Amino acid sequence: MIDFFATWCGPCVLLASELEKVKAELGESVRIVKVDTDEEATLSTQLQIQGLPTLVFVGTDMEKPALRTEGMLPAEMVKNIISNEL
């Protein structure tokens, strides 16, 4: 999972704590990569990251396309996406 965030973004801060819960529950079965959109502006533009926070879910099955969400998601919803969509 890739978390596109900004330090000044309130919902991004809230999402970070939810992602910590997900990581604590799922452990090594999930990887979370954080990308600060201010520090990585070129990458964010290339990937058309417009709303924050944006999560991009990438599974191990390369046949399935990545799933993108924008906005705050509770930990339970993130876990549901991981278990049902990836």
Regions found by a protein language model. Name each.
Residues 51, 56-86:
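Non-catalytic, surface beta->alpha helical segment in thiol-disulfide oxidoreductase systems
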Residues 11-27:
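Typically the conserved alpha-helix immediately C-terminal to a functionally engaged Cys/Sec
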Residues 1-7:
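Short active-site neighborhood of thiol/selenol oxidoreductases, capturing the structured segment around
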Residues 30-32:
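Hydrophobic/aromatic anchor residues within beta-strands of the central parallel beta-sheet
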Residues 3, 23, 34, 56-57:
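Hydrophobic beta-strand core positions in alpha/beta domains
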Residues 9-12, 55:
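The canonical Cys-X-X-Cys-His
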Residues 46-50:
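A short glycine-leucine-enriched loop at secondary-structure breakpoints
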Residues 22, 35-45:
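Structural microenvironment flanking redox-active thiols in thiol-disulfide oxidoreductases
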